């Protein structure tokens, strides 16, 4: 009602941009006739104008002023280099991002292209722009693909990848625009703040950041802090023994109520993700371990048992992790991707290794950590884009001060979202999914089935194999991950069936009829890999299907026609990666190319990554002087033109049949992830449809739906293959999802509030560290520490309320000598008759003199050594004490929750105690540095030889 009276606020916001869009369109007539060189010269002209203005705020005002002309130049460059012209709605998206907001743009509306506008505009200041994606593959794809526009206009483009050296990282961060993943950026920031020398620092000062899939990074990953850790030794036998004990414990059938223990050894709360031993469980564990008390501080077992219980009940193989090469590798619950190198902390990963009988790796201790919330708030201006942000609008506004603007689609949407079907049992649901997939597949429509875990995707895969339906499987299993781009390239072909675990952040659009451009690149890769790539750099040629029924004949070579002009039949097209057999002339071109490249680059002399890079460059449209790359480019173009004939026919066929059909097999905890899956169908106004299949056994209904849904289902006397469509059930589902979202929002808010305390401390420590690394005024800093220490000693041993005769000056002098041995001649009678301020001033003067003397002694041995020592001792103390402080703060965080029972606010208690602990840490740091500096005795040069 309010919307009708006041008008839609989003529409009002969009209206504001329309005059600027008109200006950009008018400028197009002026910009289009320019030559490439004249277009490039515009960049230098913009930079010159910005160089005349100092200060970020003033520069931003000028950026707003030149925005229409800059956007017009970028649009023209994109037209020439990529063959893509920004639509008007994409220009609006660019302006929204430039203003530091979140642009919600539906799947397939060209978010990646939109980012070129604000990133180019803000990079003109020379302060650097970061474009953040969710994984290395997307960062590389965007840097190569969109980077062409920036490079064409004369800007440098950097890329940060997981395996880069610090030197490569620094070079890439120095570029005008740098593409990176959120985790690489965060870890580089933490590593920079652990550096022992300025030369080790790779990042420069943050300015502007655009986050792709902003909801995935700022919301889904916000519960997990980034942690850099060092190893600590813990007895491995304890993990193994705990796993054995827990295997023999029995889970209680239901949670205990009203303080009464349930029957069983332990209870599990799936909502809170906790496991708790009952009284019987405690007694049984102690008996099996032959100990008197699980909490005995000399031989603690409780922590190991709790982690082993969680590993048994809450961490499920092929859902939360997979076992690969003898290691437990985490699976990201939002994207379905594996996260090698990441480990659960606090001994949880070791408990899982013990459960799976794997080699148990050392436990770790936190050296540095930060949450994504606080990391991204370090940027003076932050922007983001996603297909689904509106549901989390409030959180973006409250936590990050980011407004959300919904950008209209370029063409109206033609997707049908069919009503959910709910089944009584999981078995009934999966049979229904297999049946619907078969039905739609028979009509020649492509089908995408989204599952929530590796295990479920393999279950459906076996059901489809029974039905003899050829299909592709895309999940976290390593053999499937490597095929990701190939699988997605064919997912839109007639009758293609793709099973994918969590399509969120997959980053590749599903194009109806198939992606001929990508298939041509894959064909080139298939031809060149065996001849150009080193044997030890093992590769796998593209494989069209992971699963097919042996008896079906689908995809067998016998189906492939030898008549080159004919496309493959529908069934066999699904059994091969490529839409048609190439003509003899084209095959000959590929063989000649392969020979030429072997002659140029050497026989099997490249790594797989090097070849991928060269194929990517060849697939670009940017001009090249490299003859080999040009030959590859011509070959890709030739192959693509042949594939296009079939792909375009198939596209018409798929459109007529109704487009892509998306099936969801479970509602995700977040409505956003459901919307992302739906958004795969009907991109850019295409036809398409979606349907969700659910069962009462689904986690969402089981954990958050409450007893209401269960009793409702018992009331339905239906068999398991009968679907139920009920408004009441759908409402229960949506309220369950809202409950979960609120629950997780509260967790993230709590993580943020607690980390805010740490964040203020982190900023103070890191700025102190950076000052030391810069190396300016180190002596002044150390003397400052000494003066503060003298003041603290005076206040510790002198009571101003007592007459001066009663002051214990002997103790005071003794304490001063502990810190400064060079003041050994100091006598208590020298201090008699001085008031407190005079005492402080006298001791501080003595300290300064002693420090000058110490400096002279050290410098005599080696000039410049004193400065090195100052830097070494301050950094050593900051790092050691900060590490201990992080552990102490973690322990405080764990224990402070219990204060709630005493009617105290745990957060306020944490803030107060944390602040006291921080002050104590800084005091210890100052005192330790002073003590170390005076005790420092370098070995004479002759001793070192």
From Swiss-Prot:
Record's subcellular location: Cell inner membrane; Cellular thylakoid membrane; Cytoplasm
Documented EC number(s): 7.4.2.8
Name of the protein in its database record: Protein translocase subunit SecA
Alphabetized NCBIfam families for the sequence: secA
The protein's role, per its UniProt record: Part of the Sec protein translocase complex. Interacts with the SecYEG preprotein conducting channel. Has a central role in coupling the hydrolysis of ATP to the transfer of proteins into and across the cell membrane, serving as an ATP-driven molecular motor driving the stepwise translocation of polypeptide chains across the membrane.
Sample GO molecular function, one term: ATP binding
Bias type Basic and acidic residues, positions: 547-561
Organism ancestry: Bacteria, Bacillati, Cyanobacteriota, Cyanophyceae, Synechococcales
Keyword Iron: no
Keywords tagged on the record: ATP-binding, Cell inner membrane, Cell membrane, Cytoplasm, Membrane, Nucleotide-binding, Protein transport, Thylakoid, Translocase, Translocation, Transport
Subunit structure: Monomer and homodimer. Part of the essential Sec protein translocation apparatus which comprises SecA, SecYEG and auxiliary proteins SecDF. Other proteins may also be involved.
Catalytic activity: ATP + H2O + cellular proteinSide 1 = ADP + phosphate + cellular proteinSide 2
HAMAP family assigned: SecA (MF_01382)
GO terms for cellular component: cell envelope Sec protein transport complex; cytosol; plasma membrane-derived thylakoid membrane
Family the UniProt entry places it in: Belongs to the SecA family.
Chief location: membrane
GO biological process: intracellular protein transmembrane transport; protein import; protein targeting; protein transport by the Sec complex
Superkingdom to which the source organism belongs: Bacteria
Pfam families: P-loop_SecA, SecA_DEAD, SecA_PP_bind, SecA_SW
Source organism: Prochlorococcus marinus (strain MIT 9211)
Ranges for region Disordered: 533-568
Positions bound to ATP: 90, 108-112, 509
CDD domains per record: DEXDc_SecA, SF2_C_secA
Membrane topology category: Peripheral membrane protein
């Amino acid at each position: 009602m309010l919307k009708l009276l006041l008008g839609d606020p989003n529409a009002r916001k969009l209206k504001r941009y329309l005059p600027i869009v008109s200006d950009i369109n008018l400028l197009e007539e002026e910009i289009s006739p320019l030559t490439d060189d004249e277009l490039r010269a515009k960049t230098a002209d913009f930079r010159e104008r910005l160089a005349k203005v100092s200060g970020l705020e003033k520069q931003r005002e000028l950026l707003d002023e030149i925005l229409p002309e800059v956007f017009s130049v970028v649009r023209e460059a994109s037209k020439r280099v990529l063959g893509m012209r920004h639509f008007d709605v994409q220009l609006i998206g660019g302006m929204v991002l430039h203003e530091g907001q979140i642009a919600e743009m539906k799947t397939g509306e060209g978010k990646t292209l939109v980012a070129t506008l604000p990133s180019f505009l803000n990079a003109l200041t020379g302060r650097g722009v970061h474009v953040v994606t969710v994984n290395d593959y997307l960062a590389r794809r965007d840097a190569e693909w969109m980077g062409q526009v920036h490079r064409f206009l004369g800007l440098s483009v950097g890329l940060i990848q997981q395996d880069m050296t610090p030197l490569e990282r620094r070079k890439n961060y120095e570029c005008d625009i740098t593409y990176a993943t959120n985790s690489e950026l965060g870890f580089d920031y933490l590593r920079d703040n652990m550096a022992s020398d300025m030369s080790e620092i790779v990042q420069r000062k943050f300015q502007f950041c655009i986050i792709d899939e902003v909801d995935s990074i700022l919301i889904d990953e916000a519960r997990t802090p980034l942690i850099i850790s060092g190893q600590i030794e813990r007895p491995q036998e304890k993990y193994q023994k705990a796993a054995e004990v827990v295997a023999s414990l029995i889970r209680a059938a239901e949670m205990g109520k009203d303080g009464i223990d349930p029957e069983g050894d332990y209870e599990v709360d799936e909502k809170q993700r906790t496991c708790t031993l009952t009284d019987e469980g405690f007694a049984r564990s102690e008996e099996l371990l032959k100990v008197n008390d699980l909490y005995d501080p000399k031989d603690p077992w409780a922590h190991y048992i709790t982690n082993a219980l969680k590993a048994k009940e809450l961490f499920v193989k092929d859902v939360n992790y997979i076992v690969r090469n003898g290691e437990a590798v985490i699976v990201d619950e939002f994207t379905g991707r594996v996260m090698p190198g990441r480990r659960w902390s606090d001994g949880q990963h070791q408990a899982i290794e013990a459960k799976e009988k794997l080699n148990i790796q050392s436990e770790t201790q936190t050296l540095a950590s930060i949450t994504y919330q606080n990391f991204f708030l370090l940027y003076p201006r932050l922007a983001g884009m996603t297909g689904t942000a509106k549901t989390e609008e409030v959180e973006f506004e409250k936590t990050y001060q980011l407004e959300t603007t919904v950008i209209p689609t370029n063409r109206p949407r033609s997707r049908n979202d069919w009503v959910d079907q709910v089944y009584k049992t999981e078995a009934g649901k999966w049979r229904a999914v297999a049946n619907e997939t078969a039905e739609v597949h028979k009509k020649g429509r492509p089908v995408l089935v989204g599952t929530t875990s590796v295990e479920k995707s393999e279950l459906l895969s076996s059901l489809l194999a029974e039905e003899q339906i050829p299909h592709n499987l895309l999940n976290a299993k390593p053999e499937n991950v490597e095929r990701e781009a190939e699988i997605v390239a064919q997912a839109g072909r007639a009758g293609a069936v793709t099973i994918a675990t969590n399509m969120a952040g997959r980053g590749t659009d599903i194009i109806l009829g198939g992606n001929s451009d990508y298939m041509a690149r894959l064909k080139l890769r298939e031809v060149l890999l065996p001849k150009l790539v080193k044997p030890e750099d093992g590769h796998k040629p593209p494989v069209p299907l992971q699963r097919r029924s042996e008896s079906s004949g689908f995809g067998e070579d016998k189906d492939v026609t030898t008549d080159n002009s004919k496309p493959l039949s529908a069934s066999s097209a699904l059994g091969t990666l490529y839409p048609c057999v190439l003509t003899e002339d084209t095959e000959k071109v590929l063989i000649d190319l392969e020979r030429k490249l072997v002659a140029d680059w050497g026989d099997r002399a490249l790594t797989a990554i090097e070849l991928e890079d060269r194929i990517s460059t060849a697939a670009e449209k940017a001009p090249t002087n490299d003859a080999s790359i040009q030959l590859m480019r011509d070959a890709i173009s030739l192959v693509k033109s042949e594939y296009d004939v079939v792909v375009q026919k198939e596209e018409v066929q798929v459109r007529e049949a109704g487009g892509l059909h998306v099936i969801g097999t479970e509602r995700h905890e977040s409505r956003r992830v459901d919307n992302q899956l739906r958004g795969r169908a009907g991109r850019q106004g295409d036809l398409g449809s979606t349907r969700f299949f659910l069962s009462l056994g689904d986690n969402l209904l089981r954990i958050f739906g409450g007893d209401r849904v269960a009793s409702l289902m018992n009331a339905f006397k239906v068999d398991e293959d009968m679907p139920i469509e009920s408004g009441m059930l759908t409402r229960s589902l949506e309220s369950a999802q809202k409950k979960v979202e609120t629950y997780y929002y509260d967790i993230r808010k709590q993580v943020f509030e607690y980390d805010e305390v740490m964040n203020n401390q982190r900023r103070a420590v890191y700025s102190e560290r950076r000052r030391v690394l810069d190396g300016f005024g180190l002596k002044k800093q150390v003397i400052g520490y000494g003066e503060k220490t003298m003041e603290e000693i005076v206040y510790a041993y002198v009571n101003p309320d007592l007459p001066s005769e009663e002051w214990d000056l002997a103790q005071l002098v003794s304490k001063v000598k502990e810190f400064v041995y060079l003041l050994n001649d100091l006598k208590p009678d020298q201090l008699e008759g001085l008031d407190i301020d005079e005492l402080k001033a006298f001791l501080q003067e003595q300290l300064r003199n002693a420090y000058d003397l110490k400096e002279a002694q050290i410098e005599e041995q080696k000039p410049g050594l004193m400065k090195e020592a100052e830097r070494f001792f301050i950094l050593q103390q900051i790092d050691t004490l900060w590490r201990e402080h992080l552990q102490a703060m973690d322990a405080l965080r764990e224990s402070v929750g219990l204060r709630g029972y005493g009617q105290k606010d745990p957060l306020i208690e944490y803030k107060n105690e944390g602040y006291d602990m921080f002050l104590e840490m800084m005091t210890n740091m100052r005192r330790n540095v002073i003590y170390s500096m005076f005790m420092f005795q370098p070995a004479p040069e002759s001793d070192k030889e």
